[in-house]
Amino acid sequence: MVTTYLLFIVAYLLGSIPFALVVGKIGYGIDIREHGSGNLGGTNTFRTLGKKAGFTVTIADILKGTLATSLPMVFGLDIHPLWFGLAAVLGHVYPIFAKFRGGKAVATSAGVLLCYSPVVFAILAVVFFTLLFTTRYVSLSSMVTAVVAVIASIVTGDKIFIIAMCLLAGMVIYKHRANIGRIINKTEPKANFSKKQK
């Protein structure tokens, strides 16, 4: 029981590592929270610091979810891995190491799925990138993909999977509420794939 509680804390702390903040400060001498949207996530890093930093942060944020979800399997605990994944996402959104101002749950949630259901992860990746290249809205692509994740979980019939995806989708949409307003007002920035970045 003690091990279980400790691993939940570890999962949360893993999620709390603010890679966008670390990469910005160490690699560029910039506090990412003071630039762009102020969000500690991959999208703001891409827009503020360029492709190299953006990919680094996104991959690191994905791995947080993957590692946290794998904890019960690594330590042989008979507890559903998605609970640990949720703890990591909570840490990413409300990180103790960054005054509880974190990201929008997308990349770390993807990491949770990568560990728990690689097939669903692959399907959602196709959905996300298809939407992204069609609409060029990262936020809209993220929210729609989150809804598709819920549908995919329902198809599996896995009750805990369904609950977890509903919670994650709810978190993603909640964290993007400002983006929804900007999309409606047509002021939401679009991804510019032709723009030369660092």
Swiss-Prot record:
Catalytic activity: an acyl phosphate + sn-glycerol 3-phosphate = a 1-acyl-sn-glycero-3-phosphate + phosphate
Localisation: Cell membrane
EC number: 2.3.1.275
Pathway where this protein functions: Lipid metabolism; phospholipid metabolism
GO molecular function annotation: acyl-phosphate glycerol-3-phosphate acyltransferase activity
Transmembrane is among the record's keywords: yes
UniProt cross-references to Pfam families, sorted A to Z: G3P_acyltransf
GO cellular component: plasma membrane
Biological process annotations from GO: phospholipid biosynthetic process
Primary enzyme class: transferase
Bilayer topology term: Multi-pass membrane protein
Residues annotated as transmembrane: 4-24, 71-91, 113-133, 147-167
Subunit structure: Probably interacts with PlsX.
HAMAP family registered for this protein in UniProt: PlsY
Family (UniProt): Belongs to the PlsY family.
Protein function: Catalyzes the transfer of an acyl group from acyl-phosphate (acyl-PO(4)) to glycerol-3-phosphate (G3P) to form lysophosphatidic acid (LPA). This enzyme utilizes acyl-phosphate as fatty acyl donor, but not acyl-CoA or acyl-ACP.
Full protein name: Glycerol-3-phosphate acyltransferase 3
Gene assigned in the entry: plsY3
